[in-house]
């Protein structure tokens, strides 16, 4: 009976050791993924900045991702160009207002 307990304890130790190495590998992969996401986050376009060349590159706001909003601008020579900026759409502003109001009321 003692031999069985020793063998079981040895197996449990080996399994826990091997799984901890697997977890370390997993943590290293997650760390690399987080670093890549952080790099992407740094490259996003902040609110009120121009996004004409990268319409899907706006950063995230408090609750929602900013949207690239475009307008047509008439230049001095009479031509028209499209200018875009990252901003919060009206329905997102309304949702943020409701959530902020709810937080003030309900704490």
UniProtKB/Swiss-Prot annotation:
Disulfide bonds join 44-59, 51-68, 58-86, 70-84. Expressed by the venom gland. Keywords: Disulfide bond, Knottin, Secreted, Signal, Toxin. It is found in: Secreted. Transmembrane segments: none annotated. Residues 1-20 form the signal peptide. It comes from the Eukaryota. Its main location: secreted. GO terms for molecular function: toxin activity. The presence of a 'disulfide through disulfide knot' structurally defines this protein as a knottin. Belongs to the neurotoxin 19 (CSTX) family. 04 (U1-Lctx) subfamily. This is U1-lycotoxin-Ls1w.
């Amino acid at each position: 009976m003692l031999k069985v307990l020793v063998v079981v304890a040895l197996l449990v130790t080996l399994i826990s050791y091997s799984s901890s190495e697997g977890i370390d590998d997993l943590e290293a992969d997650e760390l690399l993924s987080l670093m890549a996401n952080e790099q992407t986050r740094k490259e996003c376009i902040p609110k009120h900045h121009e996004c004409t060349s990268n319409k899907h590159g706006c950063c995230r706001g408090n609750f929602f991702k900013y949207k690239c909003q475009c307008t047509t601008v008439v230049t001095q020579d009479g031509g028209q160009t499209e200018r875009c900026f990252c901003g919060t759409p009206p329905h997102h502003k309304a949702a943020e207002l409701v959530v902020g109001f709810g937080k003030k009321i309900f704490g």
